[in-house]
Design a protein with these regions (language model features):
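Phosphate/pyrophosphate- and phosphate-bearing ligand-binding catalytic cores of soluble enzymes
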Residues: 17-18, 24, 153-274, 278-296
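Residue-level signal for beta-strand positions within conserved beta-sheet cores that form or flank
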Residues: 93, 146, 288
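Short, well-ordered alpha-helical segments in soluble proteins
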Residues: 110, 128, 132-136, 151-154, ...
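Structural signature of FAD isoalloxazine-binding scaffolds in flavoprotein oxidoreductases
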Residues: 31-32, 38-43, 68-86, 133-164, ...
Length: 296
């Protein structure tokens, strides 16, 4: 497949990197290589590439905040959406957002244009494509609360539109087909009071800075919150705060964050996560689920 990609890449604007070290890209700064890493130029080229690779495994990365590639690497192609997927515009009563836009940048755009209900995105690391896929949320709002429509491309290179009603959004997940790539989303455009919007963003950022180790090498929330409970509380009450495996440690500031202290491996991160899962299950009979996506 590498030779085939090298051949077709000569006629494309998309950039291809082979045996790409994913630790350069993911926020954990850990993990293995991808056989092929592709910075996609535009939708037409993404269609071409998907048709050319056939059944060759692929995945997609946004900001790299919620992904870990195992040390053995990923024998497939990892796509990252380029600048043609990084556009926002307002059309009638909708905000049209490219999937490559960072969550925080959408919050800033909404603030500038006096659009409410997007403040929560200022507290979420990542890109809009990932936020839609996993129904990201915080501080009382989730993506499903503001989404109207999603545009995807499937593994055959076909464009498909989904309305909100067609997608079964749940806590940190959706039923979007696993073989599809989100390329854009349409959101409700509701105007609000600028000062209130700015105050909400200020409060969210303050809470985040005071409660999370945001300046460390971390992927954010490690585990999903169980129903009617909080992963961080369960982890702390299970005696896991400060627990360490190799160069990765459970944050003393927020127990649902794992921190790469220096040069942690992906296996150390995964091993520590497994220890936490076991400890919480043994104490509370609750099995935590990874919020971080692990591939390879």
């Amino acid at each position: 497949m590498k030779n085939h990609i090298k051949k077709i890449s000569q006629n494309l604007n998309s950039k291809f990197y082979f045996d790409y070290d994913m630790s350069k890209t993911v926020w954990f700064r850990a993990g293995g290589k991808a056989a092929i890493f592709c910075l996609v130029y535009d939708i037409n080229e993404l269609k071409i590439i998907l048709k050319e690779i056939g059944d060759f495994p692929f995945d997609i990365i946004g900001a790299g905040s919620n992904l870990l590639v195992r040390d053995r690497g990923f024998n497939g192609i990892i796509f990252k959406l380029g600048k043609e997927f990084n556009k926002i515009n307002i059309c009638e009563r909708s905000v049209n957002v490219g999937a490559g836009i960072l969550d925080n940048n959408l919050a800033k755009f909404a603030e500038v244009n006096n659009i409410k209900n997007f403040e929560f995105y200022s507290g979420i690391p990542g890109s809009i494509g990932g936020a839609v896929k996993m129904n990201a949320g915080c501080y009382g709002f989730e993506t499903k609360d503001v989404i109207k429509e999603i545009k995807c491309i499937n593994n055959k290179g076909e464009l498909i539109n989904y309305s909100k009603d067609q997608i079964n959004f749940d806590y940190r997940k959706s039923n979007l087909p696993v073989n599809s790539i989100i390329i854009s989303a349409k959101f409700d455009c509701l105007y609000g009071n600028k000062k209130e919007i700015q105050l909400n963003i200020k409060n969210i950022k303050k809470i985040r800075e005071n409660s999370q180790p945001i300046k460390s090498k971390t992927s954010g929330s490690t585990f999903k919150n169980p129903k009617n409970n909080f992963a961080a509380k369960l982890i702390e009450q299970s005696g896991c705060k400060g627990l360490q495996v190799g160069d990765v440690i459970v944050s003393e500031k927020h127990a649902n964050f794992l921190i790469n202290l220096n040069q942690a491996s992906a296996s150390e991160i995964e091993d520590l996560g497994s220890m936490i899962i076991d400890a919480v299950y043994n104490k509370f009979n609750i099995k935590l689920e990874w919020e971080i996506k692990i591939i390879g």
